[in-house]
């Protein structure tokens, strides 16, 4: 019998994760845990002593969960981890805050430099973890430091430099759960900020399948190249496997056409990688995270 650590938050067993992902695919979490607060999370981790495997889960926007589900404990930080505070000319933002919500907060408070977040689905924690970026800006451009907890239950802080940000990644330890990000603040004009955000939203509407079941950019851009151009050159715009296809509108976006499985999506992505390599000699790297067990 599985004995779980005593917590104040909520456990659910065999919890279906499909409805939490943007692709609407995937299996169950063996254990799903939403901690009450940082202290509750630390207590769980200390009691667990790294015995049960741990997977962190954000907004589900840039992820494929395999159909066999996830062993161990899936930890999702809820609304209690989404606060936005303005202290000493810095923004302190909980990791479960949506990027869009932070962009809107900054616009309402005449804070510039966060406009690009309106075009990035997902949470602050996920954005930090992958150094997400769009429209000429990345998380590394605005972060001062990161507050996190490791799987042993130790609270840790990393400066921007210590985080080792790089294109769609960082050099942070892998056994971290990001709790907060601290951002520098530059004042701007609310109307100009709103204009830029509207420009970004309009561009997304015209060039990306934002109304479809998708996970955002499928592959990271190789240095000096565009993934969508390589995919298009290989003749894969609109290509379909099962219920999954490459978008006709933007062929670096995969779409669940309504009946796709996780296997359809992963098989399609692997097929695209193979064909692009055969056509251009370039090995595309997944930008979407794939986790879980095969059926």
UniProtKB/Swiss-Prot annotation:
Keywords: Cell cycle, Cell division, Cell shape, Cell wall biogenesis/degradation, Cytoplasm, FAD, Flavoprotein, NADP, Oxidoreductase, Peptidoglycan synthesis. Pathway: Cell wall biogenesis; peptidoglycan biosynthesis. Transmembrane segments: none annotated. It catalyses: UDP-N-acetyl-alpha-D-muramate + NADP(+) = UDP-N-acetyl-3-O-(1-carboxyvinyl)-alpha-D-glucosamine + NADPH + H(+). InterPro entries: FAD-bd_PCMH, FAD-bd_PCMH-like_sf, FAD-bd_PCMH_sub1, FAD-bd_PCMH_sub2, MurB, MurB_C, MurB_C_sf, Oxid_FAD_bind_N. GO terms for cellular component: cytosol. Its main location: cytoplasm. SUPFAM superfamilies: FAD-binding/transporter-associated domain-like, Uridine diphospho-N-Acetylenolpyruvylglucosamine reductase, MurB, C-terminal domain. The keyword Calcium does not apply. NCBIfam families: murB (TIGR00179), PRK13905.1 (NF010480). Cell wall formation. This is UDP-N-acetylenolpyruvoylglucosamine reductase. It comes from Rickettsia akari (strain Hartford). The gene is murB.
């Amino acid at each position: 019998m599985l004995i779980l650590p005593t917590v104040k938050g909520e456990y659910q067993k065999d919890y279906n994760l499909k409805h939490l992902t943007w692709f609407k695919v995937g299996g169950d979490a063996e254990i799903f845990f939403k901690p009450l607060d940082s202290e509750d999370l630390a207590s769980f981790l200390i009691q667990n002593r790294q015995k049960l495997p741990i997977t962190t889960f954000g907004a589900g926007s840039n992820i494929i969960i395999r159909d066999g589900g996830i062993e161990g404990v899936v930890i999702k930080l809820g609304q209690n981890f989404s606060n936005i505070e303005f202290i000493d000319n810095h923004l302190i933002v909980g990791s479960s805050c949506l990027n869009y919500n932070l962009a809107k907060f900054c616009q309402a408070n005449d804070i510039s430099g966060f406009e690009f977040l309106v075009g990035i689905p997902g949470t602050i924690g996920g954005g930090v973890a992958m150094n997400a970026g769009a429209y000429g800006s990345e998380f590394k451009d605005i972060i001062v430091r990161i507050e996190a907890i490791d799987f042993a239950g130790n609270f840790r802080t990393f400066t921007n430099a210590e985080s080792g940000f790089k294109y769609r990644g960082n050099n942070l330890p892998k056994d971290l759960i990001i709790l907060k990000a601290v951002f520098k603040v530059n004042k701007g004009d609310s109307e100009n900020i709103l204009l830029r955000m509207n420009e970004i939203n309009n561009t997304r509407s015209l060039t990306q399948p934002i109304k479809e079941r998708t996970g955002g950019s499928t592959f990271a851009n190789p240095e000096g190249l565009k993934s969508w151009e390589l995919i298009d050159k290989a003749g894969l715009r609109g290509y379909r496997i099962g219920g999954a296809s490459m978008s006709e509108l933007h062929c670096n976006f995969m779409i669940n056409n309504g009946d796709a499985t996780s296997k359809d999506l992963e098989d399609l992505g692997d097929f695209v990688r193979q064909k692009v390599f055969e056509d251009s000699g370039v090995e595309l790297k997944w930008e979407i995270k794939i986790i879980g067990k095969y059926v």
